[in-house]
């Protein structure tokens, strides 16, 4: 999965995802996307306008907490084996490496196994 870090809407949420090593989404209509994650799903954290900045593997345990004064308005999962990239992997490089386009309009979107593997190879070879 590719999960946008909400940077353009709220820098605090972006920073929390990195510091707390978690995949989060906020508010009805978006937060429910986190429910799709299964244990050991690979999640790339994507900062809008920058690229993939980190990744980890979902622990499979959905958690909820208060966000901006609203009870259970943040859904999240911890990310195991969390890694922060030395430099962001931008959208153009993602598309080039995977040999396909991605739509970044959604908060979170799935990518196929082959694309995931190609992007991970690129990260391991050039971004860690």
Language-model features, listed with the residues they occupy:
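Short, polar loop/linker segments at the starts of domains and inter-domain junctions
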Residues: 12-24
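Short, well-ordered loop/turn sites that connect or cap secondary structure elements
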Residues: 36-38
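Contiguous surface segments at macromolecular interaction interfaces
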Residues: 1-5, 9, 23-29, 67-128
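Short beta-strand-centered aromatic/proline hotspots
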Residues: 52-62
């Amino acid at each position: 999965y590719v999960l946008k870090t909400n940077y353009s809407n709220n820098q605090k949420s972006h920073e929390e995802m990195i510091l707390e090593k978690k995949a989060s989404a906020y508010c009805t209509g978006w937060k429910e996307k986190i429910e799709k994650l299964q244990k050991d799903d690979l999640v790339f954290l994507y900062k809008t306008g920058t690229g993939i900045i980190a990744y980890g593997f979902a622990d499979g345990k959905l958690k909820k907490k208060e966000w901006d004064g609203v009870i259970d308005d943040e859904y999240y999962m911890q990310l195991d084996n969390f890694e922060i990239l030395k430099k962001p992997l931008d959208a153009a490089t993602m598309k080039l490496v995977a040999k396909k386009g991605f739509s970044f309009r959604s908060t979170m979107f799935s990518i196929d196994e082959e694309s995931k593997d190609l992007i991970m190879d690129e990260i391991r070879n050039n971004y860690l």
